[in-house]
């Protein structure tokens, strides 16, 4: 059985045992989370009101920072060049189960 969850403005396809990186969430490593699925698939597909009683149980594994991404700006003819960098914070969560 798998589920589609939404967190941090993004959607993820998860099933029991998966470890995924999501946008930064509050909580320490080892904290439990209950996420509401948008869609549950498996033997039959369920969505909308049919998944209102389903819960995806997850556990916070770690907090970290992603790889550095460089942003460059350039304008020809005027010697305008800029380079900045960014590292996105993330939270790794492990899916413990899909219950409903």
From Swiss-Prot:
Function as written in the Swiss-Prot or TrEMBL entry? This protein binds to 23S rRNA in the presence of protein L20.
Q: Matching InterPro entries, A to Z?
A: bL21-like, bL21-like_sf, Ribosomal_bL21
Subunit structure, briefly?
Part of the 50S ribosomal subunit. Contacts protein L20.
Q: Which GO terms describe its molecular function?
A: rRNA binding; structural constituent of ribosome
State the similarity comment: Belongs to the bacterial ribosomal protein bL21 family.
Keyword field? Ribonucleoprotein, Ribosomal protein, RNA-binding, rRNA-binding
Query: Which lineage is the organism of this entry classified under, starting from the top rank?
Result: Bacteria, Thermotogati, Deinococcota, Deinococci, Deinococcales
Question: Which BP terms in the Gene Ontology apply to this protein?
Answer: translation
The molecule here is called Large ribosomal subunit protein bL21
């Amino acid at each position: 059985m798998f589920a589609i969850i939404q967190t941090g403005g993004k959607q993820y396809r998860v099933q029991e045992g998966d470890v995924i990186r999501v946008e930064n969430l509050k909580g320490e490593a080892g904290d439990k989370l209950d996420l509401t699925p948008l869609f549950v698939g498996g033997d039959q597909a369920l969505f909308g009101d049919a998944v209102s009683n389903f819960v995806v149980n997850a556990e916070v594994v770690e907090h970290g920072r992603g790889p550095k991404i460089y942003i460059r700006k350039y304008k020809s003819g005027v010697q305008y060049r800029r380079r900045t960098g960014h590292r996105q914070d993330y939270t790794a969560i492990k899916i413990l189960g899909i219950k409903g």
